[in-house]
């Protein structure tokens, strides 16, 4: 099958693969065609990041599919940097602690724990369901709050 790989900025390329190929193989083919090292590539399908060790069939990627390519800056690790991760983790911990404190004021300890647990599950589910389009819209709203020079007709 033929897949189209489109960088966020730049020319797209097509690669011929089977549905049993691993994502890492697709990255190697893209590397040959676009001269972008595989370790700097992040492939997305329908807004979801693809993991190197998984097969295309694991993501139900079929013929004629279009993958988006995000190019990582040189030196950026696959995961978040240690400082950013710990900072984000500690601020997230503070948020959940604040939520827990507020719930404790209004519910019994058992009920507060249930509500707290459900809030965390719902939050994590919502994050997993974010697509690249959702993130781009959010970024556009944050970076251009006045909507200057931006087509806002598609925004809800």
UniProtKB/Swiss-Prot annotation:
One Gene Ontology term from the biological process aspect of the record: post-translational protein targeting to endoplasmic reticulum membrane
Cell compartments where the protein resides: Cytoplasm, Cytosol; Nucleus
SMART domains for the chain: UBQ
Location, primary (coarse class): cytoplasm
Domain of life of the organism encoding this protein: Eukaryota
Alphabetical UniProt keywords: Cytoplasm, Nucleus, Transport
InterPro entries assigned: Ubiquitin-like_dom (IPR000626), Ubiquitin-like_domsf (IPR029071), Ubiquitin_CS (IPR019954), Ubiquitin_dom (IPR019956), Ubl4_C_TUGS (IPR041421), UBL4A-like (IPR047154), Ubl_UBL4A-like (IPR044724)
A cellular-component GO term for this protein: BAT3 complex
Pfam families: Tugs (PF17840), ubiquitin (PF00240)
Domain Ubiquitin-like, chain residue ranges per copy: 1-76
Molecular function in Gene Ontology: protein-folding chaperone binding
Keyword Nucleus: yes
Role description: As part of a cytosolic protein quality control complex, the bag6/bat3 complex, maintains misfolded and hydrophobic patches-containing proteins in a soluble state and participates in their proper delivery to the endoplasmic reticulum or alternatively can promote their sorting to the proteasome where they undergo degradation. The bag6/bat3 complex is involved in the post-translational delivery of tail-anchored/type II transmembrane proteins to the endoplasmic reticulum membrane.
Subunit and interaction comment: Component of the bag6/bat3 complex.
Protein name: Ubiquitin-like protein 4A
Gene that specifies this protein: ubl4a
